[in-house]
Amino acid sequence: MKVIFLKDVKGKGKKGETKNVADGYANNFLIKNGYAVEANNAALSTLSAQKKKEDKLAAEELAEAKALKEKMENLTVELKAKSGEGGRLFGSITSKQIAQTLEKTHGIKIDKRKMDLPEAIRALGHTKVPVKLHHEVTATLDVHVSEE
């Protein structure tokens, strides 16, 4: 019997796949427990419509991320901090502070975990911070730390 998997089933199939399985297995386990539905014309057309919708959403997300990247590449985030001799900061600038300042000054809300800052900024000056907007799109944000 041909079935369309609604959920991942270990060793049998992934969500959205159409496979041929034994009739008893399909009726008594997969369909009964909601892991799959019988692959008839209506179910197949629903599956193809759902895949088109998911592809469209993914394309929109990618386009949105690319537009945000263009906007962010031209921005400079200005932060002020107290510093001592030689431009060393008292404390440090974290990705959380950068995200808050970016939202406050430019109105762009970015999750602090998307900023690839291996360690906090501890010196005055310009720093390039990579920001992962999408699994295919990474923007570089210019952060300028000046003396308070």
Curated annotation (Swiss-Prot):
Keywords: Ribonucleoprotein, Ribosomal protein, RNA-binding, rRNA-binding
GO cellular component assignments: ribonucleoprotein complex; ribosome
GO terms (BP aspect): translation
Keyword RNA-binding appears in the UniProt entry: yes
Keyword Repressor belongs to the record: no
Pfam families per UniProt: Ribosomal_L9_C (PF03948), Ribosomal_L9_N (PF01281)
A GO term for molecular function: rRNA binding
Superkingdom, natural source: Bacteria
Family assignment from sequence similarity: Belongs to the bacterial ribosomal protein bL9 family.
Role played: Binds to the 23S rRNA.
The protein's name: Large ribosomal subunit protein bL9
Organism annotation: Listeria monocytogenes serotype 4b (strain CLIP80459)
Taxonomic classification: Bacteria, Bacillati, Bacillota, Bacilli, Bacillales
